[in-house]
Amino acid sequence: MNKKVFSFSLLLVTLFSLLGMTTNASAEENGEFRVGMEAGYAPFNWSQKNDAHGAVPIQGNSYAGGYDVQISKKIADGLGRKLVIVQTKWDGLAPALQSGKIDAIIAGMSPTAERKKEIAFTNPYYESQFVVIVKRDGKYANAKSLKDLADAKITAQLNTFHYGLIDQIPNVNKQQAMDNFSAMRTALASGMIDGYVSERPEGITATSVNKELKMLEFPKENGFDASAEDSQVAVGMRKGDTDIEKVNKILAGISQDERTKIMDQAIKDQPAATDSDEQKTGLINDFKNIWNQYGDMFLRGAGLTLFIALIGTVVGTTLGLLIGVFRTIPDSENPVARFFQKLGNLILSIYIEVFRGTPMMVQAMVIFYGLALAFGISLDRTVAALFIVSVNTGAYMSEIVRGGIFAVDKGQFEAAQAIGMTHGQTMRKVVIPQVLRNILPATGNEFVINIKDTAVLSVIGVADLFFQGNAASGANFQFFQTFTIVGIMYLVMTFVITRILRVVERKMDGPSAYVKVEELTEEGKES
């Protein structure tokens, strides 16, 4: 049993190592220019289901369009490399660049002094002005200066220069920063906030789609005081990258008139703007329109969610069984074997405590970006997701298995020992079959949890169902409707899985678990 446990554990380690090595090799320069962006910040970037308006395929996803994409195409052409769009959450862009997951950030990012400490920036490729988005019929709709926004509940996107600008509003009621613009628009529409700070192109987009919103533009003397670099947008690249000067030359060849035309065209081409004129309005029609436009993306996301959850649960449960069995092995009489046994138990205890005691989102950031930064191990997003969910599930299942083993009557252990069975034989032939049945409900519950927990993996850009929902809501500006659809899809998946597992439980229990309808009828008549 010890040899089998060790061999299987070694096999798992080797498998993930080989996957990591394979992915690392594929991440090296192959004539590609990998650009990171949210693909959810229209009109700078958005996601769509086809290549209309010059959109570019997203790595492992659909298509990306927008101003940033068109600039990226010009840079890639100038460098003589193939453009690859890597959809990444805003918080993950800088770590992705530093760890070598992407070659550049072209996502409407300003070259602030704080960011320049971590990454390098090219010359600006766009310059904007800052505005405040409020409700058209709200208290602050007629504000003419920042002073008129006193006491207003104002927010901005997390980890952006916009959030710092709020402090320039006298007596402002500064709210917690939000993760994305979809969340801010929803908060504004629901009355949770009075307004949010954004750049003018985003303001034009928001107000053109939602007529209930209004964009406040202030004269220079009454508006935000921002330095030139803070109002500019530049390409983020790794420090020491020799391509920075090449990119600067390419950007210099794009005239201001051409940049203006590209932005104007992006505002016209964005899905929310084009669809608003073509589609019927109303809540039911909103749901239909969203499904027609993004249904394929949602289904792909749901498929990836189920795949990660299923593989993670199977591998994690197997890992939990092996660990649980190992930790119940009696102490060896051999001093050397006993030492390694205790060392193994110590290592496993640390593993269990670490993965049970830290959030999966933190684990994802450390494993996906940390391994690349510290050791040069670059994992594919899906491989990283499988690894994270598997080891996380293994940590929880190992304790469940251990409890299941201890729940088996001691008399069975004694009886097996009395007839000459070894510990391994006892486990294999007597204990484990009972444990598997006893832990089936817990295993099914872990599967359901994994389906929902894959949502946190969006922090490393895993294109699961939640990630696809974020991308869609960022493009269509319909946060409530989009995530209602996403929520229903999660509910359907978990409901179906739960019912299937109950059928499996009955099958494992045998015919005694069933009651004939005739018997129930007879009992009803007697009562």
Segments from the language model and where they lie:
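Sec-dependent signal peptide cleavage junction
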Residues: L18-E29
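Extracytoplasmic small-molecule ligand-binding "clamshell" domains
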Residues: E29-M109, K117
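Periplasmic-binding protein-like
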Residues: A39-G40, Y126-D137, V209-L251, D269-T281
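Short helix-initiation/N-cap motifs at beta->coil->alpha
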Residues: Y67-Q70, V84-P95, A141, Q176-S190, ...
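Ligand-binding clefts/hinges and TM-proximal coupling segments of bilobed small-molecule sensing domains
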Residues: K82, F161-M178, K246-N285
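A ligand-binding cleft/hinge motif common to bilobed small-molecule-binding domains
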Residues: G92-P95, G108-E118, L165-Q168, S182, ...
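Transmembrane alpha-helices and adjacent helix-loop boundaries
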Residues: K280-S527
